[in-house]
Curated annotation (Swiss-Prot):
Taxonomic lineage: Bacteria, Bacillati, Bacillota, Bacilli, Lactobacillales
Family, as annotated: Belongs to the Gfo/Idh/MocA family.
DNA repair recorded as keyword: no
Pfam families for this protein: GFO_IDH_MocA, GFO_IDH_MocA_C
Keyword line: Oxidoreductase
Identification of the protein by name: Uncharacterized oxidoreductase SP_1686
GO molecular function: nucleotide binding; oxidoreductase activity
Enzyme Commission number(s) of this protein: 1.-.-.-
Naturally occurring in which organism (per UniProt): Streptococcus pneumoniae serotype 4 (strain ATCC BAA-334 / TIGR4)
Keyword Hydrolase in record: no
Length: 367
């Protein structure tokens, strides 16, 4: 039996706990969240810890799942590692490369597993795209273009996710696409340039994050990527487009469908595990449930069908690793800290680029 403790049991943390508990040989034993732990503890038959220290030092915990707000990941990860606990941490791992480095180093020094919650890697369509690329089907990857944008209306209250100091803004909080591009390109770019600003969401009823950002990445061997995020787009889009020397792949997460284009012919594949899940995601994007290209959850709310399925898949993989299964090559970077470090390093370089109005080399961040 592998015993799990969860730090942060709001919307996403509670769902991670629920789906981990479904696995044979997995038990959620201890929860820590001063505001939200009681209800999910009662549901799962777990105990509530009175402090973070109580949870990470407990003999009833083998692995700690960290799902606090983004700016509060560092302390539980490092304390868990220092107590010899394996760690799963939600994305973004940290809001600075230095913090991320300290978290990864703490896990290495204490010889514990550290898994980054970069959940997009568990999408069926992303896995299939990686397979096609590795098999040389579309030739050499020359260029990637991602967009994750929509229009955000005023909300009853300002979520922590809209406060840059707490979430990191779109760049860090929605780091999935950046991470995905770096997986597809084989690592970090050599240089980045970021521009953007808050063009339509200023005032007391909104947070302080930029609602339009644009990132240009330059990789080795004349390869490029363009990424855009934001909540000031009346024409919403969400996709990853991969241009190769022989063909192209489009992962459309708005009108949910994967497309392979070769020799002028198109073939299609699922983004998620079933047509029902793809249709569920398409329906949500075209309904009023989305806001600014993201459905912001809140404690007590359940994830939609497509997201529940991929959480289930991610938690099942984590549990298999905890039970001693070998780490697959595809996900190796998620369990060495490399994916976490590369994603945050690039995000930091982008942030520096915008504030200093210049192109930034990744070597300035990763020294």
């Amino acid at each position: 039996m592998v015993k799990y403790g969860v730090v942060g049991t709001g919307y996403f943390g509670a769902e991670l706990a629920r789906y981990m508990q479904k696995n044979d040989g997995a038990e959620i034993t201890l929860l820590y969240d001063p505001d939200n732990a009681e209800a999910i503890a009662e549901e799962l038959g777990a105990k509530v810890a009175s402090s973070l220290d109580e949870l990470v030092s407990s003999d009833e915990v083998d692995c700690v799942i960290v799902a606090t707000p983004n700016n509060l990941h560092k302390e539980p990860v490092i304390k868990a590692a220092q107590h010899g606990k394996n760690v799963f941490c939600e994305k973004p791992i940290a809001l600075s490369y230095q913090d991320c480095r300290e978290m990864v180093d703490a896990c290495k020094e204490n010889n514990v597993t550290f898994m980054a919650g970069h959940i997009m890697n568990f999408f069926n369509g992303v896995h299939h795209a990686k397979e096609l690329i590795n098999q040389g089907v579309i030739g050499d990857v020359l260029y990637c273009h991602t967009a994750r944008n929509g229009w955000e209306e005023q909300q009853p209250s300002v979520s922590w996710k809209k406060i840059r100091e707490k979430s990191g803004g779109h760049l860090y909080h929605h780091i999935h696409e950046l991470d995905c591009v770096q997986f597809l390109m084989g690592g970090m770019p050599e240089t980045v340039t970021m521009t953007g600003g808050n063009v339509a969401h200023e005032g007391e009823h909104f947070g302080d994050e930029d609602d339009m950002i644009f990132v240009n990445m330059e990789f080795s061997n004349k390869r490029f990527a363009l990424l855009e995020w934001g909540s000031a787009y009346r024409w919403g889009e969400h996709y990853v487009l991969i241009q190769g020397s022989k063909g192209a792949i489009r992962l459309d997460l708005f009108n949910c469908k994967g497309t392979l284009k070769l020799d002028g012919q198109e073939s299609y594949f699922l983004i998620h595990e079933s047509q029902e899940e793809d249709d569920d995601r398409t329906r949500i994007y075209h309904s009023t449930e989305m806001d600014g290209a993201i459905a912001y959850g809140k404690p007590g709310k359940r994830t939609p069908l497509w997201l529940s399925s991929v959480i289930d898949k991610e938690m099942r993989y984590l549990h298999e690793i905890m039970e001693g299964a070998p780490v697959s090559e595809e996900f190796a970077k998620l369990l060495t800290g490399e994916a976490a470090l590369e994603a945050i390093a690039t995000a930091d370089a982008c942030t520096q680029s915008m504030f200093e109005d210049r192109k930034v080399k990744l070597s300035e961040i990763v020294k």
